[in-house]
């Protein structure tokens, strides 16, 4: 999995510039040659900050096969209510079976072990990147209230 932050590391690598340790990202130069290391990341973390009715604020992870997103921004903006939303806090997709993300399989019992694993990975990614929302009680309350929801 390659993330946007990896491009600056790649460019620095090709330019022969030492990449600052305090910056996120890893050069994927060897990946381009077909030499992906075994310790290369398995999941990419992302964050969507906007709080729109059709796509509220959320964060998630994506791997080769699965994608999991938590919609913490339900009802934050535009005076809309949670009942107006198109989803209920979680989206989960099996990208192998549903590459267009048309079927939210979050409630599907056959994926519950995978979802539990991905939730743990999502928390680890947030901590690793320092994206913990410690300064937002509103987001923390949403996480606390709906993290274990089974809608």
Regions found by a protein language model. Give the residues of each.
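Intrinsically disordered, low-complexity polar regions and short flexible loop motifs
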Residues: 98
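Short amphipathic alpha-helical coiled-coil/interface segments
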Residues: 118-122
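Carboxylate-dense, calcium-coordinating segments in secreted/extracellular and ER-lumen proteins
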Residues: 101-105
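C-terminal cap/loop subdomain of S1 sulfatases and analogous C-terminal strand-loop tails that border
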Residues: 4-8, 13-91, 95, 113, ...
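Catalytic nucleophile-loop/oxyanion-hole region of alpha/beta-hydrolase
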Residues: 1
């Amino acid at each position: 999995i390659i993330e946007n932050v990896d491009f600056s590391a790649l460019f620095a690598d090709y330019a022969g510039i030492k990449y600052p340790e305090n910056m996120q990202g890893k050069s994927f130069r060897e990946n381009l040659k077909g030499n992906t290391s075994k310790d290369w990341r398995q999941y990419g973390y992302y964050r969507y900050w906007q709080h729109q009715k059709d796509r509220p604020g959320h964060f998630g992870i994506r791997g080769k096969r699965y994608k999991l997103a938590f919609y913490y921004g339900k009802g934050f903006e535009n005076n809309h209510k949670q009942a107006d939303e198109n989803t209920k806090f979680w989206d989960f997709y099996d990208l192998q079976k549903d590459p267009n993300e048309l079927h939210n399989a979050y409630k599907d019992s056959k994926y519950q072990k995978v979802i539990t694993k991905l939730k743990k990975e999502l928390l680890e990614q947030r901590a690793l990147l320092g994206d913990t929302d410690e300064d937002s009680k509103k987001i923390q309350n949403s996480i606390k209230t709906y993290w274990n929801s089974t809608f």
